Structure formats: C-alpha cells, structure tokens
C-alpha cells in the first residue's frame, strides 16, 4: 500500500511509481463501502493474477497516468470498475499543444456517446399508477428493443450519412425533435468535426437498421417518479417542481455503429504505435498521437458515432412522446414532455481548462464519466447558467436515479467531470452464474415496478445486485464537492432490451 494514500475522507491518491512511467498521479473518489470494493479487487488480482480479462481499476487508473501528454491526474470516479484499457469511470485529459499527446479509443469506450436523456411531464403518480402496465406496454410496442432490434424510422444510406454529419439537426429537419430539445443537449446534439467518410462501410451497415432502437445490456427507457428534491431552486429551473411528478429517462448509445468505429480505430492505432514508437503499459491502451492521421480519423469518426447516438435518443424521445400522447389521448406538448437535459458518458472532447495556473486546450476523455460544468460556463444552456449543468445519473433496473449539477470544485479538481451511474460490482458472467432471472423479476414486481424485457436472460446481468449502490456513488461525488444533488427519481416502469 506504499503507493496508495488517502487525501480526504472521499479521495485517494495513487503515487507515481505504482506502475512504470507514470507522468502524473492517479486519484480516485470513494466512500468506505466503495473503497472496500476497490481494494478487494486489487488484492484478488495480486493473489490470483487477473480479474477476467481486465486489470483491476486501481491499476488501470495508474496505467492511464503513464500515457503521453496526460495532465493533472488520471481520475477514477466513485462508480469506477475495470474495463477495456481505461477503467469505466476513468477521466483523463491530454494537452492538445503537446505533440506527443495521444487519443485512445479505450478512453472513450466501445459504445460511443452512450448517454442519458431525461424528459419531464406534468403528470403525477396518481395519473400514471392506474395505467402503468398499459403505458409500459405502449412504450415497449413503440420503441424497438433488444440485441438485434431494427428501427421503425425509414432510413436509407443517404439519410444515415446525413444523420452522422448533422446529429440532432437531422432529427429536427425530419420532424422527430422539437427545436428546444437541442438547446438542452450536450454539444447541442451535434459534434461539428464529424466526418461520415471516416466511418467504415461495415460500421454503417451495422448502424443503418438500428437507428431509433434501444439495444440490450444496460440500456433502458424508464418511467420515473420524483421522490426527493434536494435543491428546490435548481429543480424548478429544470421544470421539476413537486414530488411524485413523472419523468422519463432514456439510456442508450450508438449501437453496433459506435462499436465498429472503436474496433476499426484500435486496429489502425496498433500500427500507428509501432510506427511512432509509442509504448504503453497495457496493450488495451492502444492509442495514436492526437494530431496524427489515425488520431484525427478516429476523432472524426467518433464525432459521427456521437451524432448517431443523439439522433438515436431523439428518435426514442419521439416514440416516447407518441406512446404517452396515445395513452392519455392528448399531445406531447399538452403533457409538457420537454427534454430537461441529455448527457454523454463515453466521449472525448476538446475543452479549455486550467492546468497549473494557465488555461490550456485539452482533449478530455470521459469513459463512464459525465461532463459536469459549473454555473456561468459558456457551454451550458442559458436556462441553466445560474445553477450549473444538469448531470443525469442512471441507476440500475429497479434502483433510484439522480439529477445533479456541476460545481466549480469539480471543474477545478476533475476537469468538470463526475460519475455516470452505479458501476458494476459483479461481472456479467458472474451475475449470470449467481442470480436467477425469475427472482430478479419477482423482486421488481414486489417493488411495484412494471417491467418489459426483450431478452429475459439478460436481466441477471443488469440486476441491482450486480452493481454498486448508486446512492453511495452519488453521495461520494456530493461529499467531495465535484457535483451537487438536486433530485432523486424512483422507477415505476422499465423497458429493457
């Protein structure tokens, strides 16, 4: 433990030397329970060599700290768990002016722009409870779900090219989004550096039939009810003004298209690393210099995949609005079904941050980590200037979700980043071995949660028991001051792939 040091009750430091070539320190945020999970994983690794195919999260955070061009610290957020290359819940920023600085697809993840969108309504629990089952069924019928699910939005190859370049502007033009939806979306739902020509034919082939589909795994659409309001002023700015108000949360990403973009880039970058003599501690950290051809190609393709994911969430928003309007025999406008915000938690972005007292342009990798900008930041919508950027934290099936806001402390300490959800505690394989799907469904039923699942066998992987406690994760971020609690939401109906 000589390389690990507790800095504050909720933050640990990983000192350089823990792994070779560390350029900056590592830091991770945990409370008592989460700390035990992190250190147990490390001890298991030390005694048994290996946790599945991944290194333990503490080691992964340290390996990222050894990548060329990194500044500040390699940061692990409270929901951190081991992933491909970077841990999921790891944030790292690289100096764009350093010719050696790199971009790594493992620092973004395979599901590019996997993210969360929250819609509010003017309905209350009393309105929805009697028709909960019908509403869940209606959502399930409207939104295509599951592993190979096909979209219902008519699309040809030309439409896909445009959607990849235009993001939510495409949804707006095609009539699937409201003008103000864009305002309440990170990047306004469109990354301008997207270049569809950098997305391979295979990725496009995978993406074409899947637009407007939910996908499987931890993706879901949830009908939620406001259970607690911690910050009345901030909640009011978001249009949340009472307990028992109904909201809808959509969690989805770029489906097979984003996965293929990441896979293609990793192949190209392995070659670039040999050519440029880039050495890394773990071959899963394949990367390329930001300004190399491979680095730029990846960033342009990643932006296109991110746009695809925003179009995807917009399409599902459209289908959600349809389902609600049909059930309540009115219009989505009458139901006040506005987007509160839409955040990404798997993405790399160019941002300005202070490093050692000077402002620098950085490429911030957030993998399983959410942007959380403070009040008055120029990149957040006018409506939220006084309270800070809304941050949406999805729980797991049957547990609570949270809305937080960004803070100045977070902007300084974690480059404006916070957690993204609960974070796995059990691997998918272990969840399947130890949990029984009927029990998982019965438990949800007892909590009064209506559930519709396309692939019941996947339920165990996503059972609350497979995850860390989302409340512990959010409370740790709140205690560390890197984001602030605003609202707690509880699910009453879940639609899953």
Curated annotation (Swiss-Prot):
Under PROSITE patterns, the record lists: UPF0027 (PS01288)
| InterPro entries xrefs | RtcB, RtcB-like_sf, RtcB_euk
Q: Which reaction does it catalyse?
A: a 3'-end 3'-phospho-ribonucleotide-RNA + a 5'-end dephospho-ribonucleoside-RNA + GTP = a ribonucleotidyl-ribonucleotide-RNA + GMP + diphosphate; a 3'-end 2',3'-cyclophospho-ribonucleotide-RNA + a 5'-end dephospho-ribonucleoside-RNA + GTP + H2O = a ribonucleotidyl-ribonucleotide-RNA + GMP + diphosphate + H(+)
UniProt-listed Enzyme Commission number(s): 6.5.1.8
What GO biological process, any one, is recorded here?
tRNA splicing, via endonucleolytic cleavage and ligation
Q: Where is the active site?
A: 420 (gmp-histidine intermediate)
| Cofactor(s) required, per the database record | Mn(2+)
- One family from Pfam that matches here is RtcB
Binding of Mn(2+) 2, residues: 114, 251, 345
What detail does the entry give on cofactor binding?
Answer: Binds 2 manganese ions per subunit.
Disulfide bonds, paired cysteine numbers = none
Q: What Gene Ontology cellular-component terms does the record carry?
A: nucleus; tRNA-splicing ligase complex
Which residues take part in binding Mn(2+) 1?
A: 111, 114, 219
Please list the GO terms describing molecular function.
GTP binding; metal ion binding; RNA ligase (GTP) activity
Positions annotated to bind GMP: 218-222, 345-346, 394-397, 401, 420-423, 496
Keyword annotations from UniProtKB, A to Z: GTP-binding, Ligase, Manganese, Metal-binding, Nucleotide-binding, tRNA processing
Q: How does it assemble?
A: Catalytic component of the tRNA-splicing ligase complex.
Share any extra remarks.
Ligation probably proceeds through 3 nucleotidyl transfer steps, with 2',3'-cyclic phosphate termini being hydrolyzed to 3'-P termini in a step that precedes 3'-P activation with GMP. In the first nucleotidyl transfer step, RTCB reacts with GTP to form a covalent RTCB-histidine-GMP intermediate with release of PPi; in the second step, the GMP moiety is transferred to the RNA 3'-P; in the third step, the 5'-OH from the opposite RNA strand attacks the activated 3'-P to form a 3',5'-phosphodiester bond and release GMP.
Q: Give the PANTHER family listed for this entry.
A: RNA-SPLICING LIGASE RTCB HOMOLOG (PTHR11118:SF1)
Please state which protein family the record places this protein in.
Answer: Belongs to the RtcB family.
Q: Main role?
A: Catalytic subunit of the tRNA-splicing ligase complex that acts by directly joining spliced tRNA halves to mature-sized tRNAs by incorporating the precursor-derived splice junction phosphate into the mature tRNA as a canonical 3',5'-phosphodiester. May act as an RNA ligase with broad substrate specificity, and may function toward other RNAs.
Record protein name field: RNA-splicing ligase RtcB homolog
Q: Which organism is it from?
A: Monosiga brevicollis (Choanoflagellate)
